[in-house]
């Protein structure tokens, strides 16, 4: 995503080179003049610089959403528990070959996880995720597939994103199906985990709450919504 699509983006760009400019001019003194005119020489050299054209920075509108199927006591049909985490931070940038630069990372504050049920939120955060010890989740993007680079200055793009997700101190390589839209220096993207995750992938067990939850399906469906700003071209 130059998603920098980290265009990660995190659209998504590559490093630009800079050139060296040099110019010189000179003059000489006349022998017929009693007082010699000093020779004047001026030289101008521009410094060599390398500017990044692909760095995208997340805004506070970015979020992560997880869905888990649960069967509640006294409810005839199962339903989805939907929890959302905000407090996203980070940046990302793509290389010309579709990989990401070192330092590309997205971090979500798991202490902000919330749903429509406070008791569920507290159980998930304190017992399942153990947010006091592991308050954040980190995603380090490593490569894209199916993304044409360099990314056009505007348009929509679909591709696969691969990276390393760390939750509760355990890291797993994951893939996302991504749909992104770029409008100059603004980038939005929705990344859906495919395949979905198991609780055991991150050293967790499916939640179990006596007298409240009959069962929880061992499947985590994760979606990351990215809103980022970056280069305009």
Language model feature labels by segment:
Residues 21-24:
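C-terminal motif of bacterial Sec signal peptides marking the signal peptidase cleavage site
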Residues 2-13:
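Bacterial N-terminal signal peptides that target proteins for export
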Residues 26-233:
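Low-complexity, acidic/polar, glycine-enriched regions of mature
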């Amino acid at each position: 995503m130059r998603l920098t699509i980290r265009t990660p983006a995190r659209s998504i760009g590559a490093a630009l080179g800079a050139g060296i400019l040099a110019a010189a001019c000179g003059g000489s003194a006349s022998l017929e003049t009693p007082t010699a005119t000093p020779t004047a020489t001026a030289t101008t050299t521009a410094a060599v610089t390398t500017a990044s054209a692909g760095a995208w920075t997340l805004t506070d509108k970015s979020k992560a959403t997880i869905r888990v199927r649960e069967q509640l006591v006294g409810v005839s049909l199962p339903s989805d528990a939907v929890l959302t985490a905000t407090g996203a931070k980070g940046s990302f940038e793509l290389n010309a070959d579709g990989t990401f630069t070192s330092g590309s990372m997205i971090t979500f504050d798991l202490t902000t996880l919330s749903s429509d049920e406070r008791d569920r939120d507290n159980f998930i955060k304190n017992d399942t995720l153990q947010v006091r010890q592991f308050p954040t989740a980190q995603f380090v993007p490593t490569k894209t597939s199916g993304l044409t680079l360099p990314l056009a200055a505007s348009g929509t793009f679909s591709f696969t994103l691969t990276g390393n997700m760390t939750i509760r101190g355990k890291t797993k390589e994951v893939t996302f199906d991504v749909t992104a839209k770029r409008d100059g220096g603004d980038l939005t993207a929705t990344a859906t985990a495919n395949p979905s995750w198991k609780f055991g992938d991150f050293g967790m067990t499916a939640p179990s709450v006596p007298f409240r939850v009959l069962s929880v399906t061992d499947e985590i469906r994760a979606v990351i919504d990215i809103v980022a700003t970056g280069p305009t071209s």
